[in-house]
Amino acid sequence: MTIINYLVTITFFILLGLFYFLLGTALLKDNEKLETTKVVIGFIFHTFLMAIVGIIFQVFKLQWMFYLIFTILWTICCLIYSLFILKTYKVKLFNQGIKDFINKYWFFVILLIIFSVSIFCNAGRMWADNLTDDGYYLVRIANLPYMNNTFSADATTGFKISGINSYTLNTWELEASVYLFISHVLPTVFIRFGMSIFNFFLIICGLHSVIGKINSYYEFDKGVSSFQYYCFIIVPILYAMTILSRSTLGLDLE
């Protein structure tokens, strides 16, 4: 059963990544743009409206089920738009072919494996609910779809809350609750494993895109396929953050 949860989670996030890539390709309509740039643009475009609508839902304490319906309709609209643009303007997903695509991004797989191994090496704390604050987000994401008074109660205690606080402007748990509800897998696997790796993937996509943009101005490297290797810098940075937090603050950032 646990294996199925992992397989469903992996499949879901692969499809989500492909959706962002498809949407970003349609929005840019430019075959010369880096594929990572297309993923980032697709992610920002899709998530931005969901965040705006999500804030409205949380401020006015609307029912979660209506947000689920909105998310599904918005995603379908983005998908239809993407397919229409790709067909109408004859935009190619892989301008130089799939072989060139693999050559430009194969190192991403290595980076994702390194990050995944790091996660499992920290599995003890990960499955022990980590820090209290992290546990709050887990419980909130898991409980939002099943609460009658979705935004009028504290997801961890069930006590009634009133007014507007900083969490009202934070919609990532709301969006994640929709994805978790659709995938129907264990919250810990989906969030700690799936979302952690997928967010890392988005980070290296953004880093790769920035490197490509800088190179377009300064031309420090002629080969696009070598941009992926510069992304390795994120690995020692993350480890340095962890070591620094342990030695100076006594915290264990994961």
Language model segments and positions:
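Alpha-helical transmembrane segments of integral membrane proteins
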Residues: 42, 65-72, 105-109, 193, ...
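Active-site lumenal/periplasmic loops and adjacent helix-entry segments of GT-C-fold
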Residues: 114-253
